[in-house]
Amino acid sequence: YRQTMKTICYIIPYFGKLPKNFQIYLLSCAQNPTVNWKILTDDRTPYEFPTNVHVQYCNYEEVKQRIKAWFDFETVIDRPWRLSLFKPAYGEIFAEELSGYDFWGHCDIDLMWGNIRTFYSENNLNKYERLGFLGHSTLYKNTPEVNARYKRIVPGEINYKDVFSGRSNYSF
């Protein structure tokens, strides 16, 4: 009896020119064939995408409108970098793209991946609902409860509505 490996997908909206070292980043993704990446971008540079990296060509305005439509209050997404403030909500916003995965995550695209499964082992994936917290690589268990946790209000603390509707740069 062999337990099925938990599925992982990182979602990365990125608009504008991808970094110079992006092809190297893709090579490091290719070294992790049991992990998928979904990149939403308007950069049509003909990179050699490995089979586990899926590109959805779209523009910043489309993703911005998708995010704005998700919330019942005014959000501020006046520059592409502000998309990063919404990372904890990607599990809900991009639920269609993440459907069927056990875990979803967000990550930076200037990482050079080693063997992801060494740290994100089956033992850790079975034990935790969130792994990582600094944003360069964070995974969340793909369940409605976990995907909605960013909405928890902690009295006296800045909450998601403050972050998503404010003009300051936050992290939470």
Q: Predicted regions span which residues?
A:
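Short, polar loop motifs at secondary-structure junctions
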Residues: 40-46
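Active-site-proximal specificity loops/subdomain of glycosyltransferases
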Residues: 46-97
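Catalytic core and acceptor-binding pocket of nucleotide-sugar-dependent glycosyltransferases
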Residues: 148-172
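A structural signal for isolated positions on well-ordered beta-strands in alpha/beta enzyme cores
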Residues: 9-11, 36-38, 54
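Short, acidic, metal-binding catalytic loop of nucleotide-sugar glycosyltransferases
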Residues: 24-36
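Short beta-strand-to-loop element that shapes/binds the nucleotide-sugar donor at the catalytic cleft/hinge
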Residues: 128-145
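GT-A fold catalytic core of metal-dependent nucleotide-sugar glycosyltransferases
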Residues: 85-132
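N-proximal low-complexity "stem/linker" segments adjacent to membrane-targeting elements
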Residues: 1-23
